[in-house]
Every structure is written in C-alpha cells, then in structure tokens.
C-alpha cells in the first residue's frame, strides 16, 4: 500500500472517529456511532499493517488474532454490571502499550547523513538541526512513558476499587499533595538529566518507577463517591498516552485519535465534576480539597418498612411516578422488570418518568445504557436538572438501588463527605419507596437521612425480586 493511500485511509478513519463521537452523543444515533467507530478502526488497522513502512506483518496479524480472540471471549462473558471494571482495565492496556512503545523507541532515532558540498556554516546548522530533532524525539519518549505509566497503574487501582478487590475509601497519606508535587518536580529534573545525557537510560527507568507510584497514588487517594469521574479521567489519560505514542511512532492518525479521546474524556470529567460540586483540579490531584469531617454512619431514627402489595396499591392510585435508578438496579439486573412496570403503568395513564443522576452507577451514562438495553423509551429518561423541580408534584418515587445520589445530607449536612453535591431531591415527593437489600451505607460510606423521613418507606430484598412482586400485584 502506497504512502498516499495510507494517508487517505487515515483521513477517512479520522473522520469516521469524529462521526462516531457525534453519533454516540444521542440515543437515537448511538448504534450508527458505534458502527462508524468499528469501520474507522478497521480501515486504520489495515492501512497501518499493510503500509509501506510496516515490518513483521505476519507476527502482527498473529498477535491481533490472539488478542482479538481474548477480547471477544471477555466481552461476551462480562455482565453489564461489570462494564466499569472492563473499561478501567482496557485503559490500563493503553497505558502499558504507551510505556512499551516508549522503551522500544528509545535510541531508535537516527540522525540523517550530512549532504556533501556544505560549507562550514551550513554544516553547523545541519548538526544543530539534527540535535534539536534528537531532543524532540527524546522528549516524546520520556513524556510517552510517563503518561503511559501513570495511566497504567491508575487504571489498575480503579479496576481494583470498582471490582471490590481494593477498599473504595480514599487513601489519605500524610502530605499527599506534597508527595504528588515532588513526583512531578523530580520527573521534570530527570527529563533534563536525560536530555543532557541520552546515552544513559537510568533517568528514564527512575522516572518510570516514580510515574507508576504517582499513578497508583493519584487514584488510590480518590474516594468511592468520585469513581465515575475517575473512569472518565482515566479515559482522558489513555487518550493522551495514545497521542504520545503517535508522536513517538510518527503516526498522524494515532495523534488525532488520542487527542479526540483525551479531550473528550477531559470534557466529560469536567461536566461530571460540576454535577458533583467537585473541583476538576481536586480530582486530578487525587482528593485535593476533600478534607471534610466524616458524618456519622449511625442510623438516625426509625425507618418504616412496606410490602410489594402496598407499593402496587400506591402505584395504582398515583397519577405521576418517578423512578430513580442506581448501581443496585444494575447489580440486581432489575432493568427488565422495571421496564415492564413502566409499560404497564403508562397503559393505565400514569405519567412515569426516570430521573438519572450524572454519576449514578460506576460509569458515565451507566443507567442510560441499562434502560436502553431494557427498551425503556428515550423520551421518559430525564437528567437530574430536567426533573428535579418536578418531585414536589409527584405522587410516588421509586428509588431502586440508588443511595448517595438521593442523599439529602448533601444539602443539609455541611460536614458530610458529599456536602454540596447536587442530588435528586426525591424526599419532596408525597411517597418515597426505597429498594434496598439492607440499611447499609452507600458507596461513599455515608448514612442516608432519607431512609428515616416520614414519607419514606423501605422495601427490603433483591431489587429484581421486589420489582417482579410489584409487577404481579399490578
């Protein structure tokens, strides 16, 4: 494949990636957006593998077949509830790939041969230009390894927290911000040392060790309530790691794709931080500004219990119902009976809508994906800002598997770890039914005063079983 054809294929692939992002921004066009991405990636892979500078094509194809087989097997096996962990571990692969590309490219920059017939001044200029190009390559290698290493360990920690293998609480080391700053300063000094003596790989090895520890500490010091932001932030890091690898490999498409992923992930992180009343810088810095007194996780009064039959009677007599799902709905796989209840109530003329918090679940858009999977109509699925003013005029709210995102302590308790975080104001409705397995605290480790309010009733048990019981009673 000629160089010109490869560049044309890269331009087409880049356009398809942009169309993919645009398509994924809306429910109606999400499937088309997914296909745009698949076609774009296929074109990019073919152009790269069979390009004029490609070597070892046979081994690359063998590696792709093995990797693809593992990927398909894992994707078919993984549950929708485990999607956040899968995304996190995939981000770690991008970071590790950037580290390996950086080390593989170390010392591979070859200076061009000096043309004959140059005078002394031209020769000096040529030598200076080659020195600059060598330094640029070494900077690309150094930064590519640094970003990749941070992404790798950060993503591994995120995977551990999301899968429950690592405690979700924030790691609060003494002087943690000074440690982060020291890691950055020492890494910068090591880059200067490396540029002054590129023959020595010791500064790169030392920086890699620091970057691995830095990435681990960044994510470990972020609490469970902020994990959805962490996933989108690591998505951004993986994009910049890919872009850095693109600079090292002199691959324009990898640079463009990495920049698209990096910028979109950063924008999504910023939007989610605003939705959680968190500073974007605080999340990047790893829990900066999160030093609040932990509010009591003790029970704060008597709670009332109810039954599926009583909830069914409430729903029969209601004219408006809002359902606020959370991660518990995903774990119980309750989205299908919830969709059935929605359809049955709408047949009776009840106005049923869904209120989705921006950080509900463990992944941006987690609840939207589950509801779309269960064929819930898009027009009844509303964001927090669109529905929060309607709770006061609502007869019944069903809180299915949500906890921290409906916690009034965020507005009422200034000492709460989630103080200031915008939440779904479900307690303003006439009746609130909370589906929970037990009275345990949520992912942020904070007790929820909602459970003890006069208009709240608790429906204990597996969310899917309880929703199916209500469906039978209807």
Swiss-Prot record:
Its main location: membrane. One of its GO terms (cellular component) is plasma membrane. One of its GO terms (molecular function) is NADP binding. The keyword NADP applies. Its EC number is 7.1.1.1. Coiled coil: none annotated. It is a multi-pass membrane protein. It holds the Pfam family PNTB. The keyword Transmembrane applies. The chain crosses the membrane at residues 4-24, 46-66, 83-103, 132-152, 181-200, 202-222, 229-249, 253-273, 321-341. It is found in: Cell inner membrane. Keywords: Cell inner membrane, Cell membrane, Membrane, NAD, NADP, Translocase, Transmembrane, Transmembrane helix. The transhydrogenation between NADH and NADP is coupled to respiration and ATP hydrolysis and functions as a proton pump across the membrane. This is NAD(P) transhydrogenase subunit beta. It comes from Haemophilus influenzae (strain ATCC 51907 / DSM 11121 / KW20 / Rd). The gene is pntB.
